[in-house]
Amino acid sequence: MRITSFFHRPRIAAAAVLAVAVTAAGLAGTITPASAALAGLYEQPLASGYDSIQSKTVVVTCPTGTAIGGGATIFNGGGKVAVEAVVPDVSAGTLTVTAKETDNYPYDWSVTARAMCAPAPAGLVRIRHWSAKDSGDKTMGTSCPGSKTLLSVGWDVGDGWGEVLVNETNLIASVGSPATGVMMSAREDDNYPDDWTLQTYVVCADPIAGQQWVSGITTSDSSSLKAVNATCPSGLNATGGAAMAVSLNAATQSELSIDSAFSLSVYGGTLNAFQSIAYEEDPITDDWYLISYAVCT
């Protein structure tokens, strides 16, 4: 396991951490599977240092099995720190997470990489797509090959330096079927002039018993912070998920920042839910909402 950090600035006293309530609701899809349910799933977390360094990268390795996905949580980012990369590597059994400050943020903060580890299921593959390198906003779709179904998603913004926000990740799925891919959008914040790239990742496997997806959604209003859970049915784990923050005014979509997206245990027990947290990166007056998707396996 390793941690790297860049661009150190002097520390200033940490800001207070907000506590938020979360809700769960939404649609679901299921399929009749071809193989046994995924077993042996567990979370392996690793946190960065808690300081005011502008960029932090954490690499966590699964002690056993391999990384079939994972997520990231930011502590004390206050909407001024965004998750820039969540990269699962099924060959190395690692999850790499990078977070960067979006503005000159003076307070201490940390990011935690949360690898989802398990014995490799049948047909396990990771698919990666990448965009052209230019200064335009980007939307990309990435799908599982053949009849494989989705376990988790990831992304990596190259040369964005905190000025590019991945704030819309939507599952490719229909009611009655499992997810088979994602549509992902990344947008420039503050008129970022430099060229940058977006890489998207999906981790897929042969269909697994009971596999389905669920979603949770917040109310649509102008509050600056939102959080929501998507909770799997009893007996299933959230092997991955996605977060989608949507402004009702397209002109302010680039001001919404995903703070955290990760699997967790609701009411104890297994990792049965996927939580998404989002902030207004700069204040807006428009209403917006947040959707959390869980891939349940």
Describe each region flagged by the PLM.
Residues 2-19:
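N-terminal export and membrane-targeting signals
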Residues 13, 22, 103:
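Residue-level detector of functional hotspots within protein domains
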Residues 20-26, 77:
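Hydrophobic alpha-helical elements and their junctions with loops/disorder across both membrane
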Residues 24-41:
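C-terminal region of N-terminal signal peptides and the immediate post-cleavage residues
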Residues 37-297:
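Extracellular attachment/recognition segments
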